[in-house]
Structure formats: C-alpha cells, structure tokens
C-alpha cells in the first residue's frame, strides 16, 4: 500500500463526508436535494464514461444497475427527510450504522461471510458496538420531548431508507458487472427516481424550476467523486476491498463534525466528547467486521 493508494482511499472521506453538509448548506426541500444530487452524479458519470470509453451494459446487468441506482435514490430521499428532523450531524452516524449492519448481515446470511462460530460471535459483538456508538452520537444532556420525538421518527425513517441502500449495494452482486461499468446506469436509475419524486411533489412547488435544485448539482459532484474514488481504492492493486471500505467509512466523522461546526447543529462539550467516542467505536467495529476471515 503506497502513498497514492492511501490518498485515493481517502477520496470518499472528502466526497461522502462533505456531501451531506453541502446538501444541507444549499438547503431546499428533500425533492430539491435529491434532484440536484442525482443530476450532478449523472453528469459526472457521463463524463467518466466518455473519458474511459465505457458503454452501457446490456441485459440483466443493465436492469440490476438501474435498480441499484433507484435503491440509492430512495434511501437518500429518506435520509434527507431525516436531516430535516435531527440534522445531518445526528442522522449520518445512524444511517452509517444501519448501512454497516445491513451490509454485514447480508454478507453473513447470503454470501457466507464470517464462517465458524467464533467469527460470528466476534462479528455480532462488533455490530452491537456499532449500534452503541450510533446511540452515543445522538445523546443529549437535556431531555426535550420534541427532540426525542423527532429522533424516534428519524431512526424509523433511516431504518426504512436502509432498504434502498441495501438494494444499491446488493443489486449489482446479482450479475458479474464491474463497478465502473455499473456507474452510469446506476446514475440513470437515480435520476429516474428523483424525477418521479419531483413530479409527485409538484403540488408543493416545481422543483425543476427552483434555483436550489440546480445548485444541489454541486453536492452530486461530491457524491460521485466519492463513489469513483471508492471504486478505484477497492481495486486489488490499490487498497483492496476490505481496506478501501474501512477508509471510506471515515467519511462519517467528517460528515458529523462539519454538520456540527459549519451548519451550527450545536452540541455541548460533553455531548461532543461522547459523539466523538461514539464515532470511534463505529469505525473500530466496522474495521473488525471487514477483517474477520
């Protein structure tokens, strides 16, 4: 593993770490955020496809790639709704924890990961630590009824959103399509869902004509940059899948801290300390789940 590989592996730290903060900073409704983000991702994917000479796949590879992108868009819409309730700095550790749990459980029960009783015990204990870490990131010193209600609603929303993120990661595994080949059709699937969602919400305003929707394209560039650098990082001649995944999960730290300091999603000193400990627990436990043989 060389310096260049590490730099590329940290690309998702910047892309996925800043994506929720930038999307929240531009503001707008979830429909504005998802439309702009998916259009930005599609633009990025088209440029990449033209640069590398990658065409659209055919057959079921195309279908599952479109479904994958649609799943992400569904999950991200739900996540944007959770941002409205508790802010990105609190929602991101929760959704990251749920995604780690979903990916790990899928790997165990569908792909045969963590063979043997000992590995399964270690793995499930690590998942428990991830949940504890996520809970620590939303702890507050003052018990406010409205916050507790919003937090419960956000957690339920993010649980539902995990279905979409699971589809995003699992659907391409139904074929032998590579990450680069799937990138463009995934982006197309994302935009299709975003357009449908925007049409369904026309009674609340025309997202296609609202300036903030087009500003959100910038947030989409950050998401797409993270996705691309993750694909490169996960290659065997770079960091490999396991190390690349762990490096990418550091994005939750940046997403949480930038939400606190740049979006004024304030925490007391004690809350901030407990949040940081919770984030460390999530990262350490996530690393354990990946490196279990």
Swiss-Prot record:
Regions crossing the membrane: 5-24, 34-51, 58-80, 95-114, 121-138, 153-170, 177-199, 212-234, 241-263, 273-292
CDD domains listed in its UniProt record: ribose_uptake_RbsU
Keywords: Cell membrane, Membrane, Sugar transport, Transmembrane, Transmembrane helix, Transport
InterPro entries per UniProt: Sugar_transport (IPR010651)
Subcellular localization: Cell membrane
GO cellular component, one term: plasma membrane
GO-annotated molecular function: carbohydrate transmembrane transporter activity
Pfam families assigned: Sugar_transport
Topology relative to the membrane: Multi-pass membrane protein
Protein task: Could be involved in the uptake of ribose.
Family designation: Belongs to the GRP transporter (TC 2.A.7.5) family.
NCBIfam families recorded: symport_RbsU (NF047342)
Full protein name: Putative ribose uptake protein RbsU
Gene responsible for this protein: rbsU
